[in-house]
Amino acid sequence: MTVGRGSNKKTSTTTSSFGVSKRESHDASKYYDSKLYQGIPKVTDVGDPQEFPEFLRDSLVCGDSRDMSMIPPNSVQLMVTSPPYNVSKEYDEDLSLQEYLSMLKDVFTETYRVLAPGGRAVINVANVGRKPYIPLTSYINMIMLEIGFLMRGEIIWDKSASAGTSCAWGSFKSASNPCLRDVHEYILVYCKGDFKLERTKQERAEGREDTIEKQEFIDFTKSIWRFPTASAKRIGHPAPFPEELPRRCIEFHTFKGDVVLDPFMGSGSTALAAKHTGRSYIGYDISQEYVDLANQRLL
């Protein structure tokens, strides 16, 4: 009896509507050519990367980030920010929802201009209110797609370990009007033009290298992150976000020496994270008080 050997050639897989569990020899082209993906931003040529001016590296600007004309186009590798929630205090006026969203669109349009090809934009935001609930994440997603950003995904920041118990419960132990207690925020991730951030062999040889450790990289690819909030009293800002948030984004999305922008710098957490990870930073805030606070924290 002759026993023939079976073929060792692997059969490639394709993406179905429900995805697949294994990715070896995987072809997703048919899926991404489907009607589901029609009408949304696609990979496109946005020009060549430009040099970021040396005199702007590691600087904080007291000014409105709707005008970042001093920054050349295609010169910033990452934007990480948490837009202000208390708009009336930060902008000295009580903006309507539409005015607030219009302001964000102006800022993120400027962000798109200054980002390098493949550069990433990361926005930390929480939905607000209860009567009714305002889904800021949905509005921001639409704004970013209208501008032309490619969406890469979203991360749930699980804050439950540091969440307090004092809050509006609605009706307690009753179906009359129970309210959800948000113990999470969102981290929305986008990119400009292409999903890949280019790096030449010469740049790598000159020190533009990855700094993230293997286990952290594996952990950061997961869509749920867990770390505590920052103390407003300790930092001196009404809504600070912890340095851990921008640090993770910076390590995950940039190389050493890259430039990180925060158009709503606030207390300076993004600048601190950039400094501590070997990146350069540029931040904007309209409040001189917060610019001074951020500069003090950077000493």
Language-model features: where?
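Core catalytic lobe of class I
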Residues: 1-293
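C-terminal helical cap(s) of enzyme catalytic domains, especially alpha/beta-barrels
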Residues: 295-299
